[in-house]
Structure formats: structure tokens, C-alpha cells
């Protein structure tokens, strides 16, 4: 039986989010609707999640002592990492000492904080099909890996980054030094190690939102949302849609792979598992033990969004992954470099039939920073995509 207390009282059920961006903000709102007291933590002030949490803190989350001090002060029941750049070894110690439970598990946060840990788990331990890959910690070893079998074209990424930061598509050797320097500059913690991957010729990419929750019999069960298709530019998600049409054979394979990798990570919560698909063939790409940016589309498509599913699963509550209707999402970019921007033409954006928007409230805009998202629902995927893009395009960011 799940027991939830009263926020801001001695009986409160307390959840601490490490990372308070736009995805964390939606998780906070979902938790608060269930009566949870939420503490939001990020590395900068006035992050989106700070604006809606019961309490907000700013600390360097890679600082183990600062992280421990805050956890001991706030005494959360659950710690929910929403980003990769965290002192995960300290989280493991906190969990081992019984101070708080880490979602989904401390081990999962350690493995998924960098691409090396999760790729070795998926490909080498679980035997999942992936692209050819290698790891390198110098330009010389990177060159040797490419010449030794990865080949051109290839993709180079920092082992630790997110949202496409530091990612390059390299066509030939003349572009290698630039890609190496870019990857090193964008890595969040370990700035000297990269993964290089062979390019997979795929038809489309999907995110399979996978939920591990506790069923009525007390055992962990695994449920899947309808596949989310998405389009990326330079590693950044720019639009997504649900459901992505695909063969039953490919979908069954993706579900089997997702169940295997999330089962190996353990714990409860929602995972974003990414795949490349060509015909009936499926390649595992990445997994995040938290809601996924491409899953913002579920705000318009599912009975319970990915954020509500995550909140319910971590609290031990029943989940419903059913699709309500097709839909799509499109990103609203900053377009400027400025603080405290304003958004014009919001009325015009919302005049597009069957659409809604979310403005994230980020304190600073960058040219390619995601400042909001438009979502559309309907009966036809392509029509939903067109309306989401239209609504997003009508919003104007001004200084």
C-alpha cells in the first residue's frame, strides 16, 4: 500500500529532483498533483523546475560533499536524477547507507551517466545489436579506431553529454581534428574521452518509452508506450510524433531489447530507450533512466504523459501507457542570445486548431536553446506534425 503524506508537514513524502530543466518541471508538477513535497536542485538560479517546486537550491551537483550536505539537510525519501552531470558515486553511497532511495537505482545513474557504461552493458553484456563503436581518449587512438574498422562516415560524441552537445558527423579524415576538439569542449565531466560510432543506414529513429512499475501483485512489471518517432538536427531533437508506424516484428524486437536493458538497470520509473529501425531490423542506440525530450509529445497523445507515468511509477502507483490519440511536437527555439526574453504571437500560435504550447521559463535564451514546445493532437500524424510546426513557428522570441 502506497502512503503519501501532506506537503510541508512532518508526514510529507519528499522527492528531490537533481536537475530542474523543462522535463524536471513537468515531473515536479505531476508529483505535486499527487500530494508530494518536491525539492528542485540545479546548477543555476531560476531554472524551470525551481519556479514550481516547494523549495529550490543551487549547487554544483558534481560536488560530492555539496550534494551530500544538501541531502542530509533536506532528508528526501526519493532522489530523482534528471540530468547526467551528477556525483553518481556519492549517490551510490547515499543509497547504500539508507539515507534515501535513488530513482531508478544508484547503479543505473552510474551506468547511464556516460555513453561508455551503457554501451558496454547493452552490447557486451546483454548482446543487443548496436552500431560498430569504439572509445578513444586521444586524437591518435581515435584515428586508429576509425582506420581499424569503424570507417567513414562516423559519428563522434563525448562519452558524457546530452542533447547533441559535442556531437559531429565526420565524413572523412580532414574533419577529424575539428570533431575531436568539439567533443572535448562539450563533454560535461570527462572532457578527454569520446565514443566513435559507425553510421547506421536506418529508415527512422524511435524512442520507446518504457515503464517499470509495481503491479497489483507487488512484482515489477514492464509496460511500453506507443513508439515515438523523431527528427534530429546535429543531435538535437527538433520534432517528434506518436505513434511511429513500424512493423510488428521490429516493434516486438524493440520491446524485447528495451525490457532487457531496463531490467538490467533495475528499479522503478520511466526510461527513454532509443533505437534505429530499418525494415524489421533494430539497433539499440541509447537509454535514459528518466523522461525523454522526444516524449514531450505525450502531453498531447496519452492518457498519462511520460511525466505522469514517471511520477506514478516511482511512487509505486498504477500506470496507464495507452495512447489516447495521435499527435506531434515541435521545438520553439530561442533564436537570440539574451536574458529575460519575451514571447510574442502566443495568441497566434494557439489559434492553430488542436494545438497547445509550453513555454519553459528558462532565464536565458541562446540561438539554439529549447525555450518551449508546441504540441498538436488529431487523427493523422502528418497533419499533426504540420500543425505543431506551424504553431511553434508563429511564436517570436524578442529581447
Curated annotation (Swiss-Prot):
One of the record's GO cellular component terms: cytosol
Binding positions for ATP per the UniProt entry: 115, 157, 162-167, 197-200, 205
One Pfam family matching this protein: ATP-grasp
First-level EC class: ligase
PROSITE patterns attached to this UniProt entry: ATP_GRASP
Signal peptide: none
Residues holding Mg(2+): 274, 286
The keyword Metal-binding is annotated on this UniProt entry: yes
Pathway the protein takes part in: Purine metabolism; IMP biosynthesis via de novo pathway; N(2)-formyl-N(1)-(5-phospho-D-ribosyl)glycinamide from N(1)-(5-phospho-D-ribosyl)glycinamide (formate route): step 1/1
ATP-grasp domain span: 120-315
Keyword Nucleotide-binding found: yes
Enzyme Commission code(s) on record: 6.3.1.21
Source organism, top-level taxon: Bacteria
Catalyzed reaction equations: N(1)-(5-phospho-beta-D-ribosyl)glycinamide + formate + ATP = N(2)-formyl-N(1)-(5-phospho-beta-D-ribosyl)glycinamide + ADP + phosphate + H(+)
Ligand binding (N(1)-(5-phospho-beta-D-ribosyl)glycinamide): 22-23, 82, 293, 362, 369-370
InterPro entries noted in UniProt: ATP-grasp, ATP-grasp_carboxylate-amine, ATP_grasp_subdomain_1, PreATP-grasp_dom_sf, PurT, PurT/PurK_preATP-grasp, PurT_C, Rudment_hybrid_motif
Single GO BP term: 'de novo' IMP biosynthetic process
Entry GO MF terms: ATP binding; magnesium ion binding; phosphoribosylglycinamide formyltransferase 2 activity; phosphoribosylglycinamide formyltransferase activity
Known partners and oligomeric status: Homodimer.
Entries under NCBIfam families matching the protein: PRK09288.1, purT
Similarity field: Belongs to the PurK/PurT family.
Family matches, as HAMAP family: PurT
UniProt name for this protein: Formate-dependent phosphoribosylglycinamide formyltransferase
Natural source organism: Thioalkalivibrio sulfidiphilus (strain HL-EbGR7)
Record lineage: Bacteria, Pseudomonadati, Pseudomonadota, Gammaproteobacteria, Chromatiales
Amino acid at each position: 500500500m502506497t502512503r503519501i503524506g501532506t506537503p510541508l508537514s512532518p508526514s510529507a513524502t519528499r522527492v528531490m529532483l537533481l536537475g530542474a530543466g523543462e522535463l524536471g518541471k513537468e515531473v515536479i508538477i505531476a508529483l505535486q498533483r499527487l500530494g508530494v513535497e518536491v525539492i528542485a536542485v540545479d546548477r543555476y538560479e531560476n531554472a524551470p523546475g525551481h519556479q514550481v517546486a516547494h523549495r529550490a537550491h543551487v549547487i554544483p551537483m558534481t560536488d560530492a560533499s555539496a550534494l551530500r550536505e544538501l541531502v542530509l539537510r533536506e532528508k528526501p525519501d526519493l532522489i530523482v536524477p534528471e540530468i547526467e552531470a551528477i556525483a553518481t558515486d556519492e549517490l551510490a553511497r547515499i543509497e547504500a547507507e539508507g539515507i534515501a532511495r535513488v530513482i531508478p537505482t544508484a547503479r543505473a545513474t552510474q551506468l547511464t551517466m556516460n555513453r561508455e557504461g551503457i554501451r558496454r552493458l547493452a552490447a557486451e553484456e546483454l548482446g543487443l545489436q548496436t552500431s560498430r563503436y569504439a572509445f578513444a581518449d586521444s586524437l591518435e587512438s581515435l584515428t586508429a579506431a576509425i582506420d581499424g574498422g569503424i570507417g567513414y562516415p562516423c559519428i563522434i560524441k563525448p562519452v558524457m553529454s546530452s542533447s547533441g552537445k559535442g556531437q559531429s558527423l565526420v565524413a572523412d579524415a580532414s574533419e577529424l581534428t575539428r570533431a575531436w576538439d568539439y567533443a572535448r569542449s562539450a563533454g560535461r565531466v570527462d572532457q578527454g574521452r569520446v565514443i566513435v560510432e559507425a553510421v547506421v543506414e536506418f529508415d527512422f529513429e524511435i524512442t520507446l518509452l518504457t515503464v517499470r512499475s509495481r503491479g497489483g501483485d507487488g512484482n515489477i512489471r514492464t509496460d511500453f508506450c506507443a513508439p515515438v518517432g523523431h527528427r534530429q538536427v546535429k543531435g538535437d531533437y527538433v520534432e517528434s510524433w506518436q505513434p511511429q508506424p513500424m512493423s510488428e516484428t521490429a516493434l516486438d524486437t524493440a520491446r524485447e531489447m528495451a525490457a532487457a536493458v531496463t531490467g538490467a538497470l533495475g528499479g522503478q520509473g520511466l526510461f527513454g530507450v532509443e533505437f534505429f529501425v530499418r525494415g524489421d531490423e533494430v539497433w539499440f542506440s541509447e537509454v535514459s533512466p528518466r523522461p525523454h525530450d522526444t516524449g514531450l509529445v505525450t502531453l498531447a497523445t496519452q492518457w498519462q504523459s511520460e511525466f505522469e507515468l514517471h511520477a506514478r511509477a516511482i511512487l509505486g502507483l498504477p500506470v496507464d501507457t495507452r495512447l489516447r490519440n495521435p499527435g506531434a511536437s515541435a521545438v520553439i527555439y530561442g533564436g537570440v542570445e539574451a536574458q529575460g526574453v519575451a514571447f510574442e504571437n502566443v495568441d497566434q500560435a494557439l489559434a492553430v486548431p488542436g494545438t497547445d504550447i509550453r513555454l519553459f521559463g528558462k532565464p536565458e535564451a541562446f540561438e539554439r536553446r529549447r525555450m518551449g514546445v508546441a504540441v498538436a493532437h488529431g487523427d493523422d500524424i502528418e497533419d499533426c506534425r504540420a500543425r505543431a510546426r506551424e504553431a511553434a513557428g508563429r511564436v517570436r522570441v524578442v529581447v
